[in-house]
């Protein structure tokens, strides 16, 4: 029997060394989740960018971490024209990241004030992926399995990743396998060499978040993780290049 992630492994197994994934862009050097942050991520040597996706009242997918703006207004209750100019649409972000890989995290928890029970955001994201980057340069992640299941139903060619920050990593691996995932995205404190080995034995890539300590980056590289998601892609690039030298 084939390992659970084997059919799409090659889309995310990008190099022998871990891939540098810029968390919300180069967010230590520019405002997170903005076009300047994505430009800097490229300049700093990141191969991939991670960003957050939410849906506005008029159905536009935009890039923003929180469900609410700083003034308390909920994105899902506003049209795209009512948003601050620094918030890009997902289409604009994907255009900016042309030639890079993009990890789109769909924010859609039941506790969120903009919770999308119909998972319409998944349908919209699938269309944008095909229009701008294609599945080979994309992976879509979420803490919400149902959101990822909906995206898989719409377009099974797009690689998916299960995000988790708590709980038993073995259960997370099992869930990822049961739901047609390509990768797991564990919170760094949960990551051990045995977790990485077990996930990869199942054909799953392991992309770890959020790692800013150079020494920890070296440890994770030794574990053989596939990607390191970091706020400081320039630091990660230097560390990994030194290890490969």
Could you say what each language-model-derived stretch is?
Residues 4-22, 149:
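N-terminal amphipathic alpha-helix/helix-capping segment at the start of soluble metabolic enzymes
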Residues 16-21, 47, 53-100, 106-109, ...:
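An active-site metal/cofactor-coordinating segment within enzyme catalytic domains
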Residues 19-21, 48, 101-105, 137-140, ...:
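Structural preference for beta-strand elements that scaffold enzyme active sites
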Residues 23, 41, 52, 83, ...:
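Conserved, mostly hydrophobic/aromatic
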Residues 25, 54-58, 66-67, 107-109, ...:
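Active-site beta-loop-alpha junctions enriched in small/polar residues
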Residues 62-63, 112-128, 142-154, 170-171, ...:
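N-terminal active-site wall of soluble small-molecule enzyme domains
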Residues 96-98, 161-245:
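C-terminal active-site rim and adjoining tail of enzyme catalytic domains
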Residues 130-135, 153-158, 201-202, 243-245:
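Short helix-capping segments at alpha-helix termini
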